[in-house]
Amino acid sequence: MHVLQNLLFNNHLSDISEKLYFDIQKGGIQPLSENDGIILEKNSRISFGTYFNYFSLNTWRKYCQLKDLHFQLQGKGEFVLRFWLTDKNYQPSSSKRVIEKQVYLNKDQDCFCIDCSFLLKKQGILHFTIDTKGECFIQGGSFCTKTDPVNYVKLGIVITHYNRKKYLIPAIRRIETQLLSNESFKNNIGLIIVDNSQDVSSEEAGEAIVISNLNYGGSGGFTRGLLYLKDHHYTHCLFMDDDASCEIESIIKTFRLLQYSAVERLAIAGTMLYEKESTIIHEKGAQYKPLSLIQLYCGLDISKFETIIATDLDKKKIEYGAWWHFAFKIEDVNYFPFPFFVKGDDMLFGLMNHFNIITVNGICVFGEDFRYKDGPLPRYLSVRANFALALIYSDCSLWIYVWRYIRWILISILTYRYASARATSIALQHVMRGPEFWTRYLSLTDIYPVISNVLSAEKMDDVDIDQLKPIIRQVRFPILKKIIIIMTFNGFFLPDFFIRDRLILSKKEIKHFPYEIFLEKNILYYSSEYNKGYVAIYNKKKFFSELFLGLKLIIQFAARFKKLKREYRQKVPKIMTEKFWRKVYQFKR
């Protein structure tokens, strides 16, 4: 039997909500450590119709070649096992029972197997429930098949690392223990660490292959790993972040889907869930919109059964997948990454290579909230990537660029984040230097002197909220007052004596709106999840300085727009090549 999907019990990532693993509908359970399974109490009902443990018939039927499907369960005790099928017409309590079995497992017979092959003709999602009569022990379970894989897969996991050892080393240990030492995978999966910070020792690396690398960001690091895989005859590549944790089953599931895939140019994008809110989706695939993106299913609670149904059956077109978890066939790569350093490289890579990208529930990572990460440096990197990407790929009009840029500047200065506004302007200046800018400055080292004066501002530090005692302002402005706010540019066109000298609390977000800080001098941008923040201060001089600089630059950009667009489109395809990157790293195949 070939295992397609293992049962998970929330034993490895203890901070993750148990609702992603099982739904206790009656009674209770006792999770055991590591791979020891769970104990179900007497007269309990447990549903495994959860994010990690349901089986997507739609995914396996549509994208893979399976001739049969079986389910195995290991444990001890007496219980009723029921399988339920739910289709796109889901309503509460409308799941159809398709299998019901009385199961008794003892010391002599601790494995139960049932043939589910007839369900391969069905559409929908499959999950099971267990009703116990006495106390039961479930050691493990899996959906499996007798069908041999249709594709040979040698998967290289590429992790680009830079000063994140506290995340990286535990990830290496988990992959070593559960994958590289597993007879089923050790000859078909390799772990490559591209060490941009050059600080991983051989002892820390263990069985991973470490490539000491110049710091050319994620773009250069992932490309260096991809070149290694090409040179060592790997068939498939999986890009993963060094600071995102995941269930190893996400990697195994990715590997199995690639083995059984019957779809040309298939790529698998992992979902990102928040590490602090582990049931909330940050992004489950994305679509490109000129100078922005659409994060699919953002904000949905994946612990809810109706969300599982919606995200499984509602297949939106995915145009690119972020590199926190992105798997693809190496021979499908026609364009190598563009040297963005970070931000935008995954977007352009997905768009230019025209992968057939899917997301699968149960394949995910848990990452830091991007709202917390926002600041001058991320803003600089994001704006320059967005402008360059649009010049390379999009046919949108000049007015889209003008509108987006002015909006970014205004939102920053109206909310007292003048360093972010300056970072936005510097980004546009660098984009206007043309494609040669990107090949000359592969690293940020030579750029830091230009942007260093804005990096120290808006820095999140530890905050004693009780000592500062900021005011929580209730924002309820009628239409007339909103009109006044807009006409006075959030009070910047009013005399300074209108401004109140007090401290107002505002949640740290990527998008801040001026209404909540109208006529206030001091704003504490604060993240309650991390107990960090900074104070932004009303400054009319900086406001007008950044506004006029922004207007000056966008006029210059408009004058050069057609020429810039032509230069990027002519020269970028020559940069996104294997030849370019081998020259960068000065080695041949």
Residues covered by each model-derived region:
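Terminal low-complexity segments of carbohydrate-biosynthetic enzymes
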Residues: M1-I125, I130, A385, L389-R589
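Active-site donor/metal-binding and catalytic loop motifs
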Residues: Q139-T147, V360-P376
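Short, well-formed alpha-helical segments that are part of the catalytic scaffolds
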Residues: R164-N182
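Conserved donor nucleotide-binding strand/loop of the catalytic core
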Residues: E204-G220
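Short beta-strand-to-loop acidic/aromatic patch adjacent to the donor-nucleotide binding site
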Residues: H232-S245
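Conserved donor NDP-sugar-binding/catalytic core segment of glycosyltransferases
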Residues: I248-L296
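A recurrent flexible, glycine/aromatic-enriched loop bordering the glycosyltransferase active site
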Residues: C298-H325, Y372
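Donor nucleotide-sugar recognition loop
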Residues: Y320-H325, I330, N334-L351, I357-V365, ...
